[in-house]
Amino acid sequence: PKIRKVLVANRGEIAIRVMRTXKELGIATV
């Protein structure tokens, strides 16, 4: 269960990171 929670948390962090990088890239491209 603990590992599962960590995996879910990591997934959320990765998603946020990807969204942030995409936003930065989008702004930089535009």
Curated annotation (Swiss-Prot):
Gene Ontology BP annotations: fatty acid biosynthetic process
Catalysis: reaction(s): propanoyl-CoA + hydrogencarbonate + ATP = (S)-methylmalonyl-CoA + ADP + phosphate + H(+)
Residue ranges annotated for the Biotin carboxylation domain, each copy included: 1-30
Temperature dependence: Optimum temperature is 25-30 degrees Celsius.
Cofactor: Mg(2+); Mn(2+); biotin
Comment on bound cofactor: Binds 2 magnesium or manganese ions per subunit.
Listed InterPro entries: BC-like_N, Biotin_carboxylation_dom, PreATP-grasp_dom_sf
Top enzyme category: ligase
Record-listed E.C. numbers: 6.4.1.3
UniProt keyword ATP-binding present: yes
Record keywords: ATP-binding, Biotin, Fatty acid biosynthesis, Fatty acid metabolism, Ligase, Lipid biosynthesis, Lipid metabolism, Nucleotide-binding
Pathway(s) annotated for this protein in UniProt: Metabolic intermediate metabolism; propanoyl-CoA degradation; succinyl-CoA from propanoyl-CoA: step 1/3
GO molecular function: ATP binding; propionyl-CoA carboxylase activity
Comment on pH dependence: Optimum pH is 7.0-7.5.
Keyword Protein biosynthesis: no
Any Pfam family hit: Biotin_carb_N
Domain notes: Consists of an N-terminal biotin carboxylation/carboxylase (BC) domain that catalyzes the transient carboxylation of the biotin covalently attached to the C-terminal biotinyl-binding/biotin carboxyl carrier (BCC) domain.
Function: This is one of the 2 subunits of the biotin-dependent propionyl-CoA carboxylase (PCC), the enzyme catalyzing the carboxylation of propionyl-CoA/propanoyl-CoA to D-methylmalonyl-CoA/(S)-methylmalonyl-CoA. Within the holoenzyme, the alpha subunit catalyzes the ATP-dependent carboxylation of the biotin carried by the biotin carboxyl carrier (BCC) domain, while the beta subunit then transfers the carboxyl group from carboxylated biotin to propionyl-CoA. Propionyl-CoA carboxylase also carboxylates acetyl-CoA, butyryl-CoA and succinyl-CoA.
Note: During development the activity increased gradually with the maximum during the sporulation stage.
Assembly and interaction partners: Dodecamer composed of six biotin-containing alpha subunits and six beta subunits.
Protein name: Propionyl-CoA carboxylase alpha chain
Record organism: Myxococcus xanthus
